[in-house]
């Protein structure tokens, strides 16, 4: 009984290897020179043509100036963000990054919320979004 199972298992493994290695990948099937030439010409026609243009010094300087303007405008835009007035802090509140277990009062920061981990054993006030 054990010999027949061993023989069947060996036969099954041999058949698996035979079927896996008997089929070559598609790129290995084409070994003929004619098929390689026709295949390569088809591949070259599939891709769009590329044109190479030489840049002179003026165009490089203009692009640098434009890049610097974009950088400065982005910095100015980030600086122009108006800070909204904070709400007055109520006395019973929890500061950011302090413990805020459920019987504790709410977080002081209006953008913060109480996040609990490890089955509500470790809770702390955290700011979730920076754009709040």
UniProtKB/Swiss-Prot annotation:
Matching SUPFAM superfamilies: Agouti-related protein
Region (Disordered): 61-87
A GO MF term: melanocortin receptor binding
Any single GO BP term: melanin biosynthetic process
Protein name per the record: Agouti-signaling protein
Function: Involved in the regulation of melanogenesis. The binding of ASP to MC1R precludes alpha-MSH initiated signaling and thus blocks production of cAMP, leading to a down-regulation of eumelanogenesis (brown/black pigment) and thus increasing synthesis of pheomelanin (yellow/red pigment).
Bias (Basic and acidic residues): 63-79
Keywords: Disulfide bond, Glycoprotein, Knottin, Secreted, Signal
PANTHER family linked to this entry: AGOUTI RELATED (PTHR16551), AGOUTI-SIGNALING PROTEIN (PTHR16551:SF1)
Signal peptide (from-to): 1-22
UniProt main location, coarse: secreted
Domain named Agouti: residues: 93-132
Disulfide bonds: 93-108, 100-114, 107-125, 111-132, 116-123
Subcellular location field: Secreted
Organism: Macaca nemestrina
Database matches in PROSITE patterns: AGOUTI_1, AGOUTI_2
Entry text on domains: The presence of a 'disulfide through disulfide knot' structurally defines this protein as a knottin.
Gene3D superfamilies assigned to the protein according to its UniProt record, in alphabetical order: Agouti domain (4.10.760.10)
UniProt-annotated glycosylation sites, renumbered to this chain: 39
Cellular component aspect of the GO annotation: extracellular space
Name of the coding gene: ASIP
Classification via InterPro entries: Agouti, Agouti_dom, Agouti_dom_sf
């Amino acid at each position: 009984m054990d010999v027949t199972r061993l023989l069947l298992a060996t036969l099954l493994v041999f058949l698996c290897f035979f079927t896996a290695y008997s089929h070559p990948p598609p790129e290995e099937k084409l070994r003929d020179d004619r098929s390689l030439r026709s295949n390569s010409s088809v591949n070259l026609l599939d891709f769009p043509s590329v044109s190479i243009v030489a840049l002179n010094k003026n165009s490089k300087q203009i692009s640098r100036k434009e890049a610097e303007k974009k950088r400065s405008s982005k910095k100015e835009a980030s600086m122009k963000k108006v800070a909204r007035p904070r709400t007055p802090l109520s006395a019973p509140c929890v500061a950011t990054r302090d413990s805020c277990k459920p019987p504790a009062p709410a977080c002081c920061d209006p953008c913060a919320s109480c996040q609990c981990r490890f089955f509500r054993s470790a809770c702390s006030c955290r700011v979730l979004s920076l754009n709040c």
